[in-house]
Amino acid sequence: MIDKVYCADVTPEMEGKKVKLAGWVYRKREVGKKVFIVLRDSSGIVQVVFSKDLNEEAYREAKKVGIESSVIIEGTVKADPRAPTGAEVQGEKLQIIQNVDFFPITKDASDEFLLDVRHLHLRSPKVAAIMKVKGTLMQAAREWLLQDGWYEVFPPILVTGAVEGGATLFKLKYFDRYAYLSQSAQLYLEAAIFGLEKVWSLTPSFRAEKSRTRRHLTEFWHLELEAAWMDLWDIMKVEEELVSYMVQRTLELRKKEIELYRKDDIKTLKNAVPPFPRISYDEAIDILQSKGVNIEWGEDMGADEERVLTEEFESPFFVYGYPKHIKAFYMKEDPEDPRKVLAADMLAPEGYGEIIGGSQREDDYDKLVQRILEEGMKPEDYEWYLDLRKYGSVPHSGFGLGLERLVAWVLKLDHVRWATLFPRTPSRLYP
């Protein structure tokens, strides 16, 4: 019986071995009495050569087959340093599962067209590489979280109130009332810490923002952590240790995929080792002003400001101590400066900016009610959340990591939309 193998398993050491391959025709060319097919599967590619002199029937089938046709091939491995993988297969049998006459994606296809046919674009090896890196980053996150004693929980997606501001909520009819798509699992994770202490979740989050920047999606994957008994400095240490492990482990396991995008430019990834640099918001404003950026103390930093700031660093770094009025209601006021909150963002270098937003949470009932009122919201809409401050409240902190933003930085992508399977933006809901 002939062993079925993956394309990447065909190596020079298998010289003379009979193999069976199943995959899709990635490239094809004809030279004289030979047809060269580059076969693709989830593992990679391998070249298969069909010779008229060796097997005329298989050669005729190979001549018929089109790009992206699905096929099963049998043949014998032959070492060849000219082949893409150092070995090729001498084709002896080709079974066409489905022949494709014309594949719509061409080399010069525009980005918008590729997004229109995203269901077909996903089969590209470069797109598959992104998804492998993304999956490995989460595999690494799970490894670290498990060994550090965190519990995974599964919060709801349908919610009744806002976490990050009511203007960015997606509203939907829920029987005889209205519900919203979750902006963040944070409030539910805060409830879970009273039984589990250190919790995390990975869920889709939804933001009805009409932002058209390279780092915004209306639906993204959100890795969120929340822990009892931790202050801001404790949670920043968790953030840098987690991100460092995710990046270094992925470098170890997905070097080939990362090099497709970064070539040998991996210095900033290797630099992602704790402790990450830390600067205050005040220092960040001073740096920006010294570089000619028109920004005043108290203003929020957008993508442009963050891009300039990242030029100062060759690794991820923290900005902490933000003004209270530009941050969310649940963040704890700085006891040493009531103008500020105990919050910190982690920014990625090379212009990528914020990948994590975190803070110590307000654990005092009266102060939290006051902040809710200051934001023009109703305390009764947050009754259950306020209950957490009435029954054994403790100091606690947490953060959220935008997975697509992390992937975009790791692979130097020009937009986060390439880091998700089917991107959702203000102008795109298909396919």
Curated annotation (Swiss-Prot):
Chief localisation class: cytoplasm
Organism superkingdom: Archaea
The family this protein is said to belong to: Belongs to the class-II aminoacyl-tRNA synthetase family.
Ligase keyword on record: yes
GO cellular component terms listed in the entry, alphabetical order: cytoplasm
GO biological process, one term: asparaginyl-tRNA aminoacylation
Keywords recorded for this protein, A-Z: Aminoacyl-tRNA synthetase, ATP-binding, Cytoplasm, Ligase, Nucleotide-binding, Protein biosynthesis
EC number, UniProt record: 6.1.1.22
Organism from which the protein derives: Thermococcus kodakarensis (strain ATCC BAA-918 / JCM 12380 / KOD1) (Pyrococcus kodakaraensis (strain KOD1))
Upper taxonomic lineage: Archaea, Methanobacteriati, Methanobacteriota, Thermococci, Thermococcales
GO molecular function: asparagine-tRNA ligase activity; ATP binding; nucleic acid binding
Subcellular location: Cytoplasm
CDD domains referenced in this protein's UniProt entry, alphabetically: AsxRS_core, PhAsnRS_like_N
Name assigned to this protein: Asparagine--tRNA ligase
Catalyzed reactions: tRNA(Asn) + L-asparagine + ATP = L-asparaginyl-tRNA(Asn) + AMP + diphosphate + H(+)
PANTHER family: ASPARAGINE--TRNA LIGASE, MITOCHONDRIAL-RELATED, ASPARTYL/LYSYL-TRNA SYNTHETASE
Keyword Secreted: no
Enzyme class, first EC level, given as a word: ligase
